[in-house]
C-alpha cells in the first residue's frame, strides 16, 4: 500500500474546534446540529465545499465542528475561526442555543445523546458498543503542514513527547455525569477506549506507517487511514501532522496559544531534521505514563522528559519550552500567541 502525502507548505496550519450546542437557559445539550448546519450551509460565505468545509457535523447531533482554511500565521487562523464561530453563535442564538466547549459536558447523560446518521459513525458505534456511546467529548485539533513526507514520522514522534504538555494545558473535563472524576481530563480516558484511538505507534519511516495501515485494513481493524484516531497522526490527504490530544478550549486566546505552541514544535522539529539531527523517541512506557499523569493531574503533573527517566514538573518544563521556542515563534509571527501559553500556566491551565 502507498499513501501519497499531499503537497503542503512547511508550517502552514489549520484548526478544528468541536463545540457543543446547549440550551441558553438550562445548559442542557440540544441535539439540533443537523438543522443548524442546514441553515448555515445556505448562508453566503459558509457553504460547505471540498476546499473549506467551514463547519461539519460530528458523531453526536449536539455537536458542530468548525474548520478553518489553510493559513501561514496563527493570528489569521484564529481570526478565521472567530469569524465562523460568530456566525454559528448568531444562528444558534436565534434558536435559544449557546455554544459550549470543554473536554466533556459536566452533567449530561452520554447514552441519551442521539448520533448523527452516517455509515462511518454507525459502523464505529456497532463495533465499540458501550464505549462508543460514551463519546460525549469535545476537542481542539491543530494541523501543521510538512513540505517533505520523510519528516512525517519523526515529527509525529517528537510531538508525542509533548502530548502531556498540550494535554495538561488544555485539560478542562474534570466532571462526568455530574461527578468529579478526580481527573483533569476525563475526555482523555474516554477516548482512548476506542481500539484505534490513543497514542500512536512510533515509526521512523513513512513506509513503516504505510505497512501498518495496510495490515490494519487487511485484518479489518479500520476501513481506511482516517479511522486511525490517534492523539497525534499524519494526515496524508492534507500533507499535515495533526495534534489531537487537546481537550476542548473555551476561548480563542487559549486556542491561539496551543496552536502557536504546536506550530512552533513542528517547525522546530522540521528544522532539526533538515540539519541532519535525529528526533528523540521516548520509550513507549514513558510516553504512556506521561499521558496518564497529564490527564490525572493537569498542570500539577510531573513528566518524564528523556529516556534516562529524568522527571520535571510540567509547570517548570513548559516555561523553559516557551523560552526555547520564542525565536521560532518570532520568525513565524506567533510570538504573542505563544506567550499566551505562559498566561495559561499562570492560571493553572485552561479556563
Describe every region a protein language model picked out.
Residues 69-137:
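Well-ordered mid-protein domain cores that form the structural environment of catalytic cofactors
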Residues 1-95, 124, 191-351:
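C-terminal accessory/tail domains of diverse enzymes
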Residues 102, 106, 119, 123-140, ...:
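Metal-dependent DNA replication initiation modules
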Amino acid at each position: 500500500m502507498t499513501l501519497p502525502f499531499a503537497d503542503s507548505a512547511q508550517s502552514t496550519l489549520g484548526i478544528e474546534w468541536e463545540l457543543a450546542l446547549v440550551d441558553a437557559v438550562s445548559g442542557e445539550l440540544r441535539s439540533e446540529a443537523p438543522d443548524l448546519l442546514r441553515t448555515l450551509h445556505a448562508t453566503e460565505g459558509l457553504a460547505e465545499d471540498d476546499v473549506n468545509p467551514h463547519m461539519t457535523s460530528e458523531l453526536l447531533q449536539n455537536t458542530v465542528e468548525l474548520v478553518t482554511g489553510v493559513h501561514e500565521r496563527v493570528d489569521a487562523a484564529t481570526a478565521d475561526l472567530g469569524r465562523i464561530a460568530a456566525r454559528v453563535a448568531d444562528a444558534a442564538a436565534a434558536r435559544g442555543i449557546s455554544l459550549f466547549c470543554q473536554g466533556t459536558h459536566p452533567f449530561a447523560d452520554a447514552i441519551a445523546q442521539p448520533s448523527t446518521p452516517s455509515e462511518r459513525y454507525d459502523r464505529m458505534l456497532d463495533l465499540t458498543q458501550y464505549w462508543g456511546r460514551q463519546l460525549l467529548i469535545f476537542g481542539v485539533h491543530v494541523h501543521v503542514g510538512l513540505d517533505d513526507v520523510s519528516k512525517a514520522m519523526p515529527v509525529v514522534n517528537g510531538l508525542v513527547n509533548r502530548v502531556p504538555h498540550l494535554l495538561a494545558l488544555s485539560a478542562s473535563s474534570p466532571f462526568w455525569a455530574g461527578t468529579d472524576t478526580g481527573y483533569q481530563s476525563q475526555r482523555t480516558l474516554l477516548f482512548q477506549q476506542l481500539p484505534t484511538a490513543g497514542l500512536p505507534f512510533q515509526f521512523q519511516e513513512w513506509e513503516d506507517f504505510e505497512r501498518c495501515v495496510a495490515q490494519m485494513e487487511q485484518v479489518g481493524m479500520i476501513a481506511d487511514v482516517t479511522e486511525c484516531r490517534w492523539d497525534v497522526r499524519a494526515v496524508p490527504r492534507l500533507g499535515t501532522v495533526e495534534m489531537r490530544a487537546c481537550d476542548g478550549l473555551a476561548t480563542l486566546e487559549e486556542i491561539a496559544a496551543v496552536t502557536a505552541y504546536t506550530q512552533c514544535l513542528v517547525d522546530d522539529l522540521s528544522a532539526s531534521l533538515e540539519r541532519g539531527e535525529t528526533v528523540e523517541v521516548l520509550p513507549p512506557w514513558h510516553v504512556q505514563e506521561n499521558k496518564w499523569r497529564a490527564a490525572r493531574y493537569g498542570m500539577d503533573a510531573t513528566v518524564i522528559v528523556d529516556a534516562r527517566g529524568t522527571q520535571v514538573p510540567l509547570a517548570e518544563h513548559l516555561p523553559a519550552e516557551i523560552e526555547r521556542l520564542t525565536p521560532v515563534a518570532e520568525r513565524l509571527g506567533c510570538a504573542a500567541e505563544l506567550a499566551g501559553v505562559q498566561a495559561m500556566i499562570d492560571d493553572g491551565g485552561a479556563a
